[in-house]
Design a protein with these regions (language model features):
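Residues forming the flavin
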Residues: 1-204
Length: 204
């Protein structure tokens, strides 16, 4: 089972290798039973867990429970952030890798972490058109990721944010973004840079 479709490293090779390594370790462990294609649909008192596999119900009673729900992206608040075309980066990666769906033609990425850079490289490798990356930080934690995007001639707007998602009259989806420099906490510059795009990915 794979819940995350994120890229883990610059070359995009680490995730599959790590997944296979962990799967092998778990499957070979004498005290671990792996139940695939199963659903735990509740968590009752005293750690009673009904687990459904196909047409069979397993009544599991555990001493301890660990819920590994995975990581998640946090959306960014700005004007018109509920327009169609504004989407979490992880959702785009899932659409692309699981369903082979291209969400749009021109993509802008708004990020506050290095995952945004890794996602941009994922999209470029898949043949998608990344027109810009907007980073709310002044510098990327991993300089190599910034360098990789610059080498592919992707404009990177550092220390900036999306002030507003733009749309044309009577067209209720993203047609561009208004990018502004962050000048202090909670305050942005009055000077704006407008970038045409039909998808805005957020990874913060």
């Amino acid at each position: 089972i794979r819940d995350s479709y994120a890229r883990f490293d610059l070359k995009g090779e680490k995730a599959d290798a790590l997944r296979q390594q962990l799967l092998s370790a778990v499957e070979q462990h004498a005290n671990i039973t792996v139940m695939t294609e199963s659903i735990c649909n509740a968590w009752f008192t005293d750690h009673y867990l009904p687990v459904i596999q196909s047409k069979r119900l397993y009544k599991v009673r555990a001493k301890q429970c660990i819920v590994a729900s995975g990581s998640f992206d946090q959306p960014v608040v700005f004007r018109n952030n509920d327009l169609p075309g504004v989407i979490l980066t992880s959702a785009v990666q899932r659409l692309m890798k699981l369903y082979a769906v291209q969400p749009g033609q021109k993509m802008t990425i708004l990020t506050g972490n290095d995952d945004g850079y890794l996602a941009a490289l994922d999209f470029i490798d898949a043949g998608l058109n990344v027109v810009a990356l907007v980073d709310m930080r002044e510098t990327a934690k991993d300089a190599a990721l910034y360098g990789a995007l610059k080498a592919k001639k992707i404009p990177c707007y550092m220390g900036s944010t999306v002030y507003e998602a733009l749309h044309e009259k009577h067209m209720h989806r993203v047609t561009g973004v208004d990018v502004r420099k962050i000048v202090s906490e909670g305050e942005v510059s009055t000077e704006s840079k407008q970038i045409a795009c039909d998808v805005l990915c957020m990874s913060s």
